[in-house]
Amino acid sequence: MNITLILFLIGILGFVLNRKNIILMLISIEIMLLAITFLILVSSLNMDDIIGQTYAIYIIVVAGAESAIGLGILVAFYRLRGSIAIEYK
């Protein structure tokens, strides 16, 4: 439980501190999702339930698809603007 909380807080901290870099924001979101998946997996192992393990595998597959789509959008954004930095006004 403590490891998942630490991972989730690292993800939140990375997201908050790197507001101008889209790649680091995506990595931070993936770290938070990994923490939640790890919590579901550990909880299902403690309760000896296979449904939680199935959910964890499903979440990992969806996260992989999400990352691929996000990076594809990021490449298109870079080709359009020439930069991936976020500008706040």
Swiss-Prot record:
Give EC number(s), comma-separated: 7.1.1.2
Topology with respect to the bilayer: Multi-pass membrane protein
Q: Which domain of life is it from?
A: Eukaryota
Disulfide bridge partners, by residue number: none
Q: Which GO terms describe its biological process?
A: ATP synthesis coupled electron transport
Sorted keywords for this record are: Electron transport, Membrane, Mitochondrion, NAD, Respiratory chain, Translocase, Transmembrane, Transmembrane helix, Transport, Ubiquinone
Effect in UniProt of substituting A85S = In strain: A+
Q: Which GO terms describe its molecular function?
A: NADH dehydrogenase (ubiquinone) activity
Q: Which GO terms describe its cellular component?
A: mitochondrial membrane; NADH dehydrogenase complex
List the coiled-coil residues. none
Sequence intervals crossing the membrane: 1-21, 22-42, 57-77
Q: Which Pfam families match?
A: Oxidored_q2
- The primary location reported for this protein is mitochondrion
Localisation per UniProt entry: Mitochondrion membrane
Give me the reactions it catalyses: a ubiquinone + NADH + 5 H(+)(in) = a ubiquinol + NAD(+) + 4 H(+)(out)
Q: Which family does it belong to?
A: Belongs to the complex I subunit 4L family.
Function recorded in the entry: Core subunit of the mitochondrial membrane respiratory chain NADH dehydrogenase (Complex I) that is believed to belong to the minimal assembly required for catalysis. Complex I functions in the transfer of electrons from NADH to the respiratory chain. The immediate electron acceptor for the enzyme is believed to be ubiquinone.
Q: Spell out the PANTHER family in the cross-references.
A: NADH-UBIQUINONE OXIDOREDUCTASE CHAIN 4L, NADH-UBIQUINONE OXIDOREDUCTASE SUBUNIT ND4L
Entry's NCBIfam families?
Answer: PRK05715.1-2
For this entry, the protein name equals NADH-ubiquinone oxidoreductase chain 4L
Q: Which organism is it from?
A: Podospora anserina (strain S / ATCC MYA-4624 / DSM 980 / FGSC 10383) (Pleurage anserina)
Q: Which gene encodes it?
A: ND4L
